[in-house]
Amino acid sequence: VICCSWSWWLNHQHLLPEPEQLIAAMLPIASLEDPLTAARVESLKRQGRDWFRTLLLPEALATLIPAIASLRRGGGRLAILDGRVRGRSWGEQVLRALEPWEALQRLLPD
C-alpha cells in the first residue's frame, strides 16, 4: 500500500510494479490556495469565463489520464472516492474521460 500525492505518483510510478488497484481519494484538481492557480482563475473570472471547466477540470483530467495509464494496461481497478464525481454536473465529463469504465461493487481483494 502506497499513500501519496498525485505528483509523487506521476514521478515515481515507473519505478514500481504495475498496481492491481489505485484508490484516488480526491481528483487532482489544483488548489486555489496556489498563487499561480489563483491568478489564472482570477484572470478567467475577469473575462467572464467558466474558470473551473476552462482551466481546473481540463488540467485535472490531463493529470489523471497519464496517472492511470499503467493501471489500464494491466487491467487494474481505479476507485475514485471523490464524491464530487457523482454529485457535481462536471462529474459526467470525468467519467467520459475514463471510458470504458464500470462501477465497482467492492475493492480488492475479492
Question: What is each model feature region?
Answer:
Residues 2-88:
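Conserved RecA-like P-loop NTPase helicase motor core
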Residues 87-110:
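Short, low-complexity, polybasic intrinsically disordered segments
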